[in-house]
């Protein structure tokens, strides 16, 4: 998944080493708990060398968990997921939503019947742990009371076993990581500029062979369109094009629209993000401003 994710090329990676790239296959599940463990491990390695980790991306939920912690959510269970998917295929996702509503009405009110990924995860959490997502999130307050020393002690125990299941050994959930964070957003100053950038980026992807990239997955028996990786913006539309459900023009248009919608959701997150420094992409002094903010930050 190189083109559709805009992964940096080898020349750039050599100049600016990145971590947590190419760590799983598209058919594998990846949870918030796994990211927490992987990110913490890499951040420890970087700070041990006297360097400052730079976290870059667009998954706001992951950023929030790194900084604020999370209730102890169980790792993905493929057997449970398959059972839920089988029920959904037989009875429909509205039936799955009704099941969730019976055990966790709060989560059901937030998750639409048309959102299979989140529905599946919410029901999976309950079947694996015996607790609802709402119950686990309510336990968040007990996590916040942990000290930095406790975090290191518990994570050292976890780090002896790189399996993600080891996270369950941290009693009460995942505490926020023991770092001081400086948060930046870098975005175009107006919506028109943003939309132009999105359209240009999608066309660059197509010109660079994005359809051929998706076709490789389309032809693999172990890759399905309902998998998280293939539901990503761009990949979903390209898959539907290869499936004959969309024309090329429809695929391009829907891919651009879906990307705009994703950007809108990200900007909505950012509007309520605490202690955020907002910078503009067209500011020629943006790097100097960011460096000054970091240098003046109180750690």
Task: Give residue spans per PLM region.
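Phosphate/pyrophosphate-binding catalytic cores of soluble transferases and nucleic-acid-acting enzymes
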Residues: 1-299
